[in-house]
Amino acid sequence: MGISQQAASQHLRELEDEGLITRNAEGKGISVMVTDKGRHELLRVYNILHDSLHSRPDHVEITGTLVSGMNEGAYYMSREGYTGQFQERLGYVPFPGTLNVDTDRKHGPEIARLDGMNGTIIDGFTDGKRSYGWVKCFAGTLNGTIPCHLIRLERTHHGSSTVELISKLDIRKETGLDDGGKITIRIPLEQED
């Protein structure tokens, strides 16, 4: 690689300190694993390079399958610390609950692209008993007709391939979709603040 062993060790230590990799001693060497945070950072850099070298699309399109969640979305979406911000920043208070969508693994770069975008931030807050994380919202449409926001959360129990949607509408009722239903989410890459 053209650098000394000490310089390589220092770089690895910095990456580990930032939570981008983990290192484990194995025999006479070490094993290096990229963390989820590191994978997201790699995808973010990939998207920047890709957009610099290729024509940039004007939207991200994500397909997936509707799945049941843990019924926590209704609780969180109805917290007073969030509802006022939703009304102020998105123009509506979401229908209680989130729509959970398992995306195909091939959409990892698109999801990482969203993670690297600004979106509309709903600030985290504390209610005296516990703290609640931030929510990053991206305006879009579901199946070409239903206005919604894809949300990325500071704290979530879902894996990286699951995204959540909110809307002022009861999406399940409006679409007649049940678990297992296929959906398409379209998110413009230029988001208005």
Swiss-Prot record:
SUPFAM superfamilies attached to this UniProt entry: Riboflavin kinase-like, Winged helix' DNA-binding domain
InterPro entries named among the record's database cross-references: ArsR-like_HTH, HTH_ArsR_DNA-bd_dom, RibK_CTP-dep, Riboflavin_kinase_archaeal, Riboflavin_kinase_CTP-dep, Riboflavin_kinase_dom_sf, WH-like_DNA-bd_sf, WH_DNA-bd_sf
Positions of FMN binding: 156, 164
UniProt binding sites for Mg(2+): 98, 100
Domain of life (superkingdom): Archaea
Region (Riboflavin kinase): 60-193
Chain positions covered by the region annotation H-T-H motif-like: 1-59
Cofactor note: Binds 1 Mg(2+) ion per subunit.
GO terms under biological process: FMN biosynthetic process; riboflavin biosynthetic process
Residues the entry annotates as binding CDP: 69-74, 169-172
Xref: PANTHER family: RIBOFLAVIN KINASE
Protein name in the entry: Riboflavin kinase
Species in which this protein is naturally found: Cenarchaeum symbiosum (strain A)
Lineage: Archaea, Nitrososphaerota, Candidatus Cenarchaeales, Candidatus Cenarchaeaceae, Candidatus Cenarchaeum
Gene: ribK
